[in-house]
Regions:
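Bacterial Sec-dependent signal peptides at the C-terminal "C-region" and cleavage site
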Residues: 12-30
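A short beta-strand motif characteristic of beta-propeller blades
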Residues: 33-39, 75-81, 116-123, 165-171, ...
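A short loop-to-beta-strand structural motif that recurs across blades of beta-propeller domains
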Residues: 66-68, 104-106, 155-158, 197-199, ...
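Blade-level signature of beta-propeller repeat domains, shared across WD40, Kelch, NHL, RCC1
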Residues: 274-328
Length: 328
């Protein structure tokens, strides 16, 4: 598997880099330590997103088929179990969310547990499943699929509107991940994990059309692969890197590495800003892909971590609601 093979190389190089620094630019890179926010053993923790109305962090364990709601003040989690993999969660109202299950998009009521299908997703006869997703500033869900063999390029990035209309936006994808929008709403940043870089697309807020605008970031060799992603108010990209022991912060305009959040787990999967002032970075991790020896060496794998990195994030967009942040 792509991620498993890359992990061995990435872990070796990441440990070496941690020991010797970052070469000529090491003094310019800020290092921040993450701490455990919630101790658990998620097989594939993913999809971290803050719910401002509830003051909680939502996230999923894809292989555990479970949606979680972490309440920071109580240090406790609520959970909801599903009969299929649950891969993405975005807020809709103060009590409903929209979820990507492995082969469909549904509305889910956190109070009543009522489920309503919005649209099915083409999984090519089970060769694909849904993966990461987020809502655009105009309230449309952008969600991608991934190839279960992590090799073929059959997957697609879709745009799902509240009406149920679904459009294919990017084809030829292997593992769709980490989509965010710039503060001026004119650009999308997007990861197809095995490529090892972050793509930039020109974005039309009104039509939803996108045009490839180049590579924003080439992930440094040996630091893992780009997974989930968040963006701060200064348009810096905070990228969870599978096999990279951390979240890496890049300048979206220059591609320069600015900071690294050190996480004591190899497989870092997603991140999201949250908290009352949107200044806490929450981070999910995974136990999947690790050998028994690696799990013994990194026993906190699967936990949710957090830190205050000195940056402020932007609130998430809600499904079906247009962002009140003004286009520049």
């Amino acid at each position: 598997m792509i991620r498993a093979c890359k992990l061995i190389q990435a872990m070796t190089v990441a440990l070496l880099l941690a020991a010797i620094g970052w070469g000529t630019s090491c003094s310019e890179v800020k290092h921040i330590n993450a701490e455990v926010a919630y101790q658990t053993e998620a097989q594939l923790g993913e999809g971290a997103i803050w719910h401002p109305d509830r003051g909680t962090l939502l996230w999923v364990d894809i292989e555990g088929r479970t949606l979680y709601e972490f309440m920071p003040e109580k240090k406790k989690c609520r959970s909801w179990k599903f009969d299929r993999r649950v891969t993405t969660v975005v807020p809709e109202t103060d009590h409903t969310v929209v979820l990507a299950l492995e082969n469909s998009i549904i509305r889910f009521d956190l109070n009543t547990r009522e489920k309503t299908e919005i649209t099915p997703i083409d999984t090519k006869g089970g060769r694909l499943r849904c993966n990461d997703g987020k809502c655009s500033p105009n309230g449309w869900l952008w969600v991608g699929t991934m190839s279960l063999d992590e090799k073929s390029s059959e997957a697609t990035l879709y745009c799902v509107r509240p009406t149920g209309r679904i459009d294919a936006m990017v084809r030829g994808v292997t593992i769709s991940n980490g989509i965010v929008w710039s503060s001026n709403k004119k650009y999308i940043y997007y990861n197809d994990t095995p490529t090892g870089h972050i793509r930039r697309f020109r974005y039309n807020l009104h039509s939803g059309d996108i045009i490839m605008n180049g590579i924003a970031v080439d992930i440094p060799e040996g630091t893992g692969l780009p997974d989930g992603m968040a963006i701060d108010r200064n348009d810096n990209l905070w990228v969870a890197q599978w096999g990279g022991f951390g979240v890496y912060c890049y300048n979206a305009y220059t591609g320069e590495l600015i900071a690294k959040v050190e996480v004591p787990a190899p497989n870092v999967t997603s991140c999201a800003f949250g908290g009352e002032h949107m200044d806490v970075l929450y981070i999910t991790t995974a136990r999947e892909g690790l050998t028994p020896d690696e799990l013994a060496a990194y026993p906190l794998s699967g936990c949710v971590f957090s830190c205050r990195p000195g940056a402020v994030g932007v609130p998430p967009n809600y499904f079906g609601q247009e962002s009140n942040q003004q286009e520049e």
